[in-house]
Amino acid sequence: MAAADPAPTHARERRDVVVPVSGPEDPPERAWLVLPHRHPVSTLLDETRDAVVGLAETLAAVLPVTVLAHPRDAGAARLVPPEVDLLRAPVGSPLLGRTGPSFIRRPEGLAAVAWRSAAGLTGTGPLDGAAATAVAEAAGLPLLTPLLCAPRGAWVTDGEGTAVVAADPVLDGRINGAWTPGQVAAEFAALLGITRVLWVPPAPRPDTGPWGGPGHLASWVRLQGDGEAAVHWRGDRFHPEHPYAAAALRFLQGADDAAGRPLRVRTVTGAAQPAEYDPAERGPRSLLDTLPLGAAVLRPAFEDAAGEEAAAAACTALHPGLPQLSFPAPPLLRLAGALNDLVLLQPRP
């Protein structure tokens, strides 16, 4: 697209009132997941499907859950428990939290945003775009389709007008052509109500899960509101997660949020890998990979006592007062992805 037109989008229909997009602490109305019917490693498909169903059951203890399954998935009805809604849709990977729709509040109510696909460059597949349509139709929400590709996994927000955005992929010329940082920031302001965009500069970031592509930025950076932020950390300079963690930390320290407050940034060291672990596990063992659910918070669980203690303490600091649910992180990283990669939370109207 031409660089002179910074952000053509259907959202231009209503720009008089733009409410900042929901932050991580906003209570959700429903959780959405995808039950995959294919897998990059075919021998792991059944185990992955079982893990997704287990995650749905865990979430269903505190809020309504819908699982999307492909129309040709004959076994889905037997797997999905009765307390979880099953919806047929032409979906692909289970990375709905990374590639699914974003939700915005407009004067007339909640709407969904289907970002332009970056299939093949961010771990997405050709069918992932259909998930946004399926979710919007099932939820009865209008669907906006901007020309910008800013997948939900590439940015996080505090719900107060500030967003941290990964320069890679959003400023990747293969994905967004000649879009400049200023043009992207203008689109974020018009569509999402975000008035302060902070860019994490490009740095090596390990893939998360067997579908490939960088995992959700929420595993690396958490904006907590009131000028507070947390960064997933690895102090060992030889650790493959150190370069991206260091890039995020350097950039955010001293940066201001949308209210003009200097961000107070702290580091949260990820859980350690035990001496014996499955080398197929891909992605950060991040303690920031949590999902506030309103009445509770879902956090990653780990196989060793030290990891569990650290995860519980980090979750308490991030979400004080919320009861904690947990789900094993190492199997998910081996089979599918992080919690924020897999779970899409729809905010209340």
Predicted regions span which residues?
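The feature marks the mature, well-folded catalytic cores of soluble enzymes
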Residues: 2-349
